[in-house]
Structure formats: structure tokens, C-alpha cells
Amino acid sequence: MKPGIHPEYRKVVFHDTSVDHYFVVGSTLQTDRTIEWEDGQTYPYFTIEVSSESHPFYTGKQRVVQKEGRVANFNRRFAQFGSKEG
């Protein structure tokens, strides 16, 4: 690798503010904020709104869309355009 052109890879503390969960991940993210972690070391700190701790796909708390109601509503509104009158 060419020296001097790659961003610094380091551990960063991410804070999922929606569920108040902290985790450390390796990243090249640049931030001026820092936080002291549980191991006593100081790491760069970054807040996020969604992570695997809060995203519906990973938590299993997905919102179910009522497809039948939407389809029925569509068919009711546009049924007249589908009928062929001779």
C-alpha cells in the first residue's frame, strides 16, 4: 500500500441513541468527540439513530403493512376502468 494516502483505521464508539446502546467497531470515521470506554481507554465517539440493536429487521419487531386493504381499495377505485363494455 502506498504510504500517506489511506485513512487511519481505529476503534470508534458508536452510540445508538434510539435504544441507548453503545458498541465499539473498527472504522475510518473522523470525529472530534471522544468518550471513555469500559476498558478505561478513550475512543472517538459518534452518535447514530439506527443500528442492529434498534432496526426492525434485526429486532424482529417489524411493522406489518396491511396489503389486503390497500389492494382492495385500489380495486374498488379503478374497477370501472377494467371492465370492457361492447
Swiss-Prot record:
UniProt KW keywords: Ribonucleoprotein, Ribosomal protein
GO terms for cellular component: ribonucleoprotein complex; ribosome
InterPro entries: Ribosomal_bL28/bL31-like_sf, Ribosomal_bL31, Ribosomal_bL31_B, Ribosomal_bL31_sf
GO molecular function, a single term: structural constituent of ribosome
Biological process annotations from GO: translation
Keyword Protease: no
Any Pfam family: Ribosomal_L31
Subunit structure: Part of the 50S ribosomal subunit.
Family: Belongs to the bacterial ribosomal protein bL31 family. Type B subfamily.
Full protein name: Large ribosomal subunit protein bL31B
Organism: Vibrio vulnificus (strain YJ016)
